[in-house]
Amino acid sequence: MIISSANDYREAARRRVPPFMFHYADGGSFSERTLERNVTDLADLALRQRVLKDMSQLDTEIELFGEKLAMPAVLAPVGACGMYARRGEVQAAQAAENKGIPFTLSTVSICPIEEVTAAIKRPMWFQLYVLKDRGFMKHVLERAKAAGCSTLVFTVDMPTPGARYRDRHSGMSGDYKEIRRALQAVTHPFWAWDVGIKGKPHTLGNVSAYTGKAVGLDDYVVWLGENFDPSISWKDLEWIRDFWDGPMVIKGILDPEDAKDAVRFGADGIVVSNHGGRQLDGALSSARALPSIADAVKGDIKILADSGIRNGLDIVRMLALGADATMLGRAFVYALGAAGKAGVENMLDIFKKEMHVAMTLTSNQKISDITRDALVDLSKL
């Protein structure tokens, strides 16, 4: 099929990847209203077109936590990327490096930290969940530190798992899931060969290294469910702040008061995020939550935003709402599932070209030029 956008990659991934993995990435929680609003609230923001400005020196580069980024985007942490393409985390990390942006490895990746860092030269970011097993948290932090990971992304919006009903229908969970997955693999032969056979092992590399035994997808669901910690508070994060030498980013902020707490805590950055609509259905979309958070803490802490970004125009919209940079999740997973490393590289090229168009036609020559003036207040029309 012809690929011209991230939406095309979604359709290509739907055809190529078995339903249990496609819907794991594509779905949200409960009735998926927040998942839907993440996309529509962002897309509904009208850009303010300005003309006859010299845009010949347009530049999408930024500096974030001491790193040069070719554009204000970071590949977000996504669990089990190695089930979308053969050793998928390695392929995605290499694509990000080639396009000049960071890659963030999930705690629950297929490829372990050391396998990914050995395949790239650029320091990657590492994401950690709040878990009851502090021994695991310390173990994986030590490994991330030893491997040269530059920035820690601490996800705080999962003290309990969201109700992802679509997973039960797709075969990711629920009755007879093993049989259903096997049948799906038979009907997706390219994936079965490239990922199912040549992409082994399909264990969670970081978790398996700690437990000393292979932890597969089914074990991972149980293990995570048992280890989510609803008692976590800011005080519990202090030892992590003390242990980690580099920048620390708190992911999962939707309220200005929580953003202020992150500043008081001493975090270097926050990610305005509702976990891609996979946790609390009915929560604000990131686009709706971002402006008040930016008003509260802009300049005191770096603000990243994710959830709902499907093209380069959406990146510009997030920046206009107050973000310093963005994180891309589903968009790169679709491209990874459809075409591996080459797909992710092409997707990032598409996003960058779309940013060029949006910046040119809103007359913003540099990323720092983009403010809310780039948006039209439709309520006044």
UniProtKB/Swiss-Prot annotation:
Cross-referenced SUPFAM superfamilies: FMN-linked oxidoreductases
Superkingdom per UniProt: Bacteria
Chief location: membrane
Domain FMN hydroxy acid dehydrogenase: 1-380
Keywords annotated in UniProt: Cell inner membrane, Cell membrane, Flavoprotein, FMN, Membrane, Oxidoreductase
InterPro entries xref list: Aldolase_TIM, Alpha-hydoxy_acid_DH_FMN, FMN-dep_DH, FMN_HAD, FMN_hydac_DH_AS, LldD
GO molecular function, one term: FMN binding
Compartments it resides in: Cell inner membrane
Cofactor: FMN
Binding annotation for substrate: Y24, Y129, R164, R278
Binding-site residues for FMN, renumbered to this chain: 106, 127, 155, 251, 306-330
Protein name: L-lactate dehydrogenase
Gene that encodes the chain: lldD
